[in-house]
Regions:
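DPxDG-like acidic metal-binding loop motif
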Residues: 89-100, 104-123
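Gly/Ser/Thr-rich loops at beta-strand to alpha-helix junctions
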Residues: 176-180, 200-203, 221-227
């Protein structure tokens, strides 16, 4: 039976959870924004985490953490397998990044976000917390137009042909990290333009699905768990992504094998990383090409959020006004 057309039950719950997800990211974004430019990324991350955790605990759901926070946050953690929500209602898996772009926010820079995704039980692939090679494009292209096994030149020429443009008109987004230095050189040699970001590869990937973002393709190495969040977003927004684990040493190889990833050359697509009915929400913490940042004035916080649902392919932009007294 089509979940979306079924009477009662799960489809209605999904719609309700979409708005609840936005409330969670709004709370985290407001808390983090208060520390913008303060130079303390740990404090900002802790504030976002605490606000997100508190908001999650108020949702009528039996939530299980798939991707959480494991760096302490003042002694509080949410690890895979931990429970969130009231314990009543639908069973869901939760993947969260309370503050993407910690270093950006600490410097007062643009494009910090609060992110949350929810899936049916078993909906998120459980990667180890290691590096992940990624490539992503927006909707409207032939399947497998880009591939991690293609050369940089082939990927960009294929995309340019699909777009009906020249390679030098394309914009490639990727993290400004030493691990991407060779890729950056290759992109420049092919002739495409580059948008380097300091942090937050989930937001970079999401931009490929937003026609007016100015980004045509995302490439490079980031985090594996962030790849799952990005896949959740693209499931609702449209687009293609491939990812592959990047193992740097024996310890990381052991982590991957322990979780069942025996073929380290395997490529994963969105539908494998985020399966079934998915809800994804993001709220801007600071201004960026995807979302406006939190604006606080006269005891009022104004937020700008995006929520998408994979089953309907619906994208909603929501502006929220939050009295702070």
């Amino acid at each position: 039976m089509d979940r979306e057309n079924a009477n009662g039950g799960e489809a209605q719950i999904d719609r309700n959870l979409a708005m609840e997800a936005v409330r969670v990211t709004e709370a985290a974004a407001i808390a983090a924004n208060r520390l913008m430019g303060g130079g303390d990324e740990k404090a900002a991350d802790q504030a976002a985490f605490k606000a997100m955790f508190k908001a999650l605990q108020n949702i009528d759901m039996a939530g299980t953490v798939s991707i959480g926070e494991n760096e302490g946050n003042g002694g509080t953690k949410l690890l895979p397998g931990d429970s969130v929500g009231t314990g009543e209602g639908v069973n869901v898996e939760v993947a969260m990044v309370p503050l993407e772009g910690k270093s950006i926010l600490a410097r007062g820079g643009p494009n910090a976000l609060s992110l949350l995704a929810m899936a049916e039980a078993g909906g998120f692939l459980k990667f180890p917390d290691i590096y992940f090679e990624k490539i992503a494009v927006g909707a409207g292209h032939p399947k497998s137009i880009v591939d991690l096994d293609y050369s940089t030149e082939t990927n960009l020429k294929n995309l340019a042909e699909s777009n009906g443009c020249c390679v030098n008109e394309l914009v490639v987004c990727l993290l400004d990290r030493p691990r991407n230095a060779e890729l950056i050189t290759n992109i420049r040699e092919v002739g495409a333009r580059i948008r380097l970001i300091l942090d937050g590869d989930v937001s970079g990937i999401i931009q490929v699905a937003k026609p007016d973002s100015g980004v045509d393709i995302y490439m490079g190495i980031g985090g594996a768990q962030e790849g799952v969040l990005a896949a959740a977003a693209l499931r609702g927004m449209g687009g293609q992504m491939q990812g592959r684990l990047v193992v740097r040493n024996a310890e990381e190889e052991s982590k991957a094998i322990e979780l069942g990833f025996n073929d380290l050359n395997r490529k994963f697509v969105c539908e494998e990383m985020a399966y079934g009915n998915i809800t994804f929400a993001a709220t801007g913490v600071t201004y960026g090409p995807l979302l406006e940042g939190v604006h606080i004035s006269n005891e009022l916080a104004i937020t700008h959020s995006l929520v998408v649902r994979s089953q309907t392919k619906t994208m909603r932009y929501i502006k929220g006004y939050h009295p702070l007294k």
